Amino acid sequence: MVPLRPLALGDIVTGSFSTLRLHWKRMAGVALLVQAVLLLAMGLVAAASVAAVFPHLEPVFDAPYGEAPTREHVMPLLVAAAVLFVALAVLGMLGMAVISAACLAVLKEAVSGGPTTFAAVRRVAFRRAPAMAGAMFLGYLIAGLPVLAVVAVWAPLAVATASEAAPGALLVPLVLGMLAAFPVAVWLSVRFGLAPAAVVMEDAGPVAALRRSTALVRGDWWRVFGITLVGALLAGAIGYAIQLPFNLIGSFVIVPAIALAEDGVSAAGAITVLVVAVLVTLAGGIAGQLFQIGFMQLVAGLLYTDQRIRREGLAEALLAGHAVPPAAPATAPEPPQQQDAPQDGR
């Protein structure tokens, strides 16, 4: 499936599609399991957040006409919203880490020629998920530092000069700063782009995986960037194509819901149709997102494999590991031993 030689762009794209085609059941099984757990956990977190601030909802969103909500009701809602955002972001990153680890675990066995079972993929995915999430978080954080630095410098200046400068003039420094920070952020993201593969392929920790990715990308940044860009474009286009039928079906299903509401039919029927439309659209979004995550991780994993083949002779090591040991040399049968004949008189 994956040739053990330096890989060209076509080899990487073809290998990614081949891995998806041959092992999609295992990857989809882990992904659906993760999505089910995530939806349940996110629902519980959201319900707990709403329950915690429920007494403050009516004073803020249904305040008497002409009266502004008081601080004692607004602040708990802001705190709950911030906590909910962080909790959902953490859960989302953990889910993406498990799915990414599952895809790379399948690729690892495909490259090395080992068996890939659902149980084995699930074990590796959940075992490496914390390290994967750590590597992803550190990579995103470091890559986003240039953009955060621009915003941190621009925001106080914008507040200090808001009353004096024209609104359009305040955006000029921000745009210029972003134009300078964006290339640096892209350079850093490509530099750390092979870290997830190192987490699964080498059982590396988050920091070690970032260092490993830096070492493998060094000197080949433009090649890694180009192949990653092609993979991202393919993943985005195919992911959108997967979502489109679901979105169209969801849009068509919403029309009867509107008609039911206008005809004065019971609200339960309209709500049921609306829920079906939302679920169909949500299913399409999840399917498209899972494809994009899986395909991009396979592209990154094959790039990692290619860099190791080119730099470290990984192909020779894998071939040596799968070589059949030579058979033992055949030995000639020993001649039968002759027994001494009994002598007379003895």
Label each residue range with its predicted role.
Residues 33, 37, 87, 138-142, ...:
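Hydrophobic residues within alpha-helical transmembrane segments
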Residues 1-50, 54, 115-119, 181-263:
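Nonpolar helix-loop interface/hinge motif
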Residues 130-184, 199, 203, 333-346:
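Alpha-helical transmembrane segments of multi-pass integral membrane proteins
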Residues 2-5, 77-113, 150, 166-209, ...:
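Selective recognition of hydrophobic, aromatic-rich stretches within alpha-helical transmembrane segments
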Residues 1-96, 100-126, 140:
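N-terminal membrane-targeting/anchoring modules of bacterial envelope and secretion proteins
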Residues 4, 15, 19, 29, ...:
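Membrane-embedded alpha-helical bundles of multi-pass transporters/translocases
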Residues 42-89, 147-182, 243-289:
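Membrane-helix interface segments in multi-pass membrane proteins
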